[in-house]
Design a protein with these regions (language model features):
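TPR/Sel1-like alpha-solenoid repeat signature
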Residues: 44-47, 115-121
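Hydrophobic packing residues in well-ordered alpha-helices of helical domains and bundles
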Residues: 11, 36, 41, 114, ...
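Conserved, well-structured interaction surfaces
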Residues: 1-58, 72-108
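Short glycine/serine- and small hydrophobic-enriched flexible loop segments
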Residues: 23, 52-56, 117-127
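Short linear capping/connector segments at secondary-structure termini
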Residues: 66-72
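An aromatic- and glycine-enriched ligand-binding surface/loop that stacks and positions planar moieties
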Residues: 59-61, 93, 112, 120-223
Length: 223
């Protein structure tokens, strides 16, 4: 399923909004530092999220971390996949630091949401799909591609990438709680399994019989 909200132009429009917000927050004249930190944390999370969406669909993309004026040069080269992943992780780390311990209303970015986003992008980055030597050993598709670095890692330690993904996944599970009725040591009936799945997928909001409304507590980021 591909939504129009994930297209290139829309994502960069939202990234620009984040850039403008961060620039304005840095020069804001009000004295509420806690509010400045919270707003900055949300903007960093959203900027990382939008870049993560772009990387999912396009691989390496131009990294833009400032707002542009009308007379500036807009011809910006695509960054490597590795650089994009690094940028997203940095955005998540900034959001985690700024939002840690902050109680947020439903639908707003949280430290746990940033931990989850970091875990997701590092898991994607560690996969075979983004290790160019592995791909080249399995298919000739990339043999004529001039810029493999925008599709994945052309070198580096794969084990280290998996380890980073593992550490990030453990961090979000420890912070947010995990395992809603998914204990593999306690099998359930097929019907109960369906109800558990619906409860998780719908966040407890489904009206289907048997759905557990308490599953809403498992939602890390939603609207």
């Amino acid at each position: 399923w591909v939504s129009g909200t994930y297209n290139w132009a829309t994502m960069y429009s939202r990234i620009r909004s984040c850039n403008v917000a961060l620039e304005n927050i840095r020069t804001a004249t009000f004295d509420n530092q806690a509010l400045k930190d919270r707003l900055s944390g949300e903007a960093h999370f959203l900027r990382g999220y939008y870049y993560h969406q772009l990387v999912r669909y396009y691989g390496g993309v131009p990294l833009i971390d400032k707002s542009y004026g009308l007379n500036e040069d807009y011809t910006i080269a695509r960054s490597s996949f590795e650089d994009c992943v690094g940028f997203i992780v940095k955005e998540c780390d900034s959001a985690i630091a700024l939002l840690d311990g902050v109680s947020m209303a439903k639908g707003r970015a949280t430290a746990n949401a940033a931990l989850a986003l970091k875990s997701r992008i590092l898991l994607y980055a560690a996969s075979d799909m983004h290790d160019i030597p592995t791909l080249q050993s399995k298919t000739s598709f990339l043999s004529g591609y001039a810029a493999p670095e925008v599709l994945g890692y052309t070198s580096g330690d794969r084990i280290a990438r998996w380890q980073a993904a593992k550490v990030a996944a453990k961090a979000v599970m420890d912070a947010a709680g995990s395992g809603y009725k998914l204990g593999l040591n306690a099998p359930v009936t097929t019907e109960q399994g369906k109800n558990n799945y619906m409860s998780i997928a719908m966040g407890g909001g489904s009206k289907a019989p048997g759905v557990d409304a308490s599953a809403a507590s498992e939602i890390i980021f939603g609207r």
